[in-house]
């Protein structure tokens, strides 16, 4: 019976390490999670990361961006190392910046940009929204909204109504006198 009990306890660890992305190595942690080590593998894109990952080591690769939502399926992730990658710090890195701000704010000062020129050799945490770029997002001028014209029309009608009401009151009071 003890053999079956041990097998039952080790089953999650073996299934987690079988889902390990190539060329990374995976190790089960005592905290029922997974350590995924992809350091120095020359990765240019994120591999598919197992859902039970608690530690993810992506340092010393060739990663330039992180797709939006890349870590959203990893609720147990508490240690992420993305240092020493040639990050292209434009709006495509906004997701990584926001994720790090929420989960590991101290790491923002250790993630350095390789490009564009405006951001080269600067920590991701020091960049402003302007420096990250807009990705083509542009707010239309405030007069472009149809709601603004509706508001202006309502104000004009209200003012005209008040003028008419004042005129009627004035006429009514003059006729009584």
From Swiss-Prot:
Membrane-crossing residue ranges in chain numbering: 148-168
InterPro entries: Cys-rich_flank_reg_C, GPIb-IX-V_Complex, Leu-rich_rpt, LRR_dom_sf, LRRNT
Ranges for the LRR repeats: 60-83
Pfam families in alphabetical order: LRR_8, LRRNT
GO cellular component entries: glycoprotein Ib-IX-V complex
Subcellular location per the Swiss-Prot or TrEMBL entry: Membrane
Glycosylation sites: 60
Disulphide linkage map: none
Protein known as: Platelet glycoprotein IX
Protein species of origin: Mus musculus
Gene: Gp9
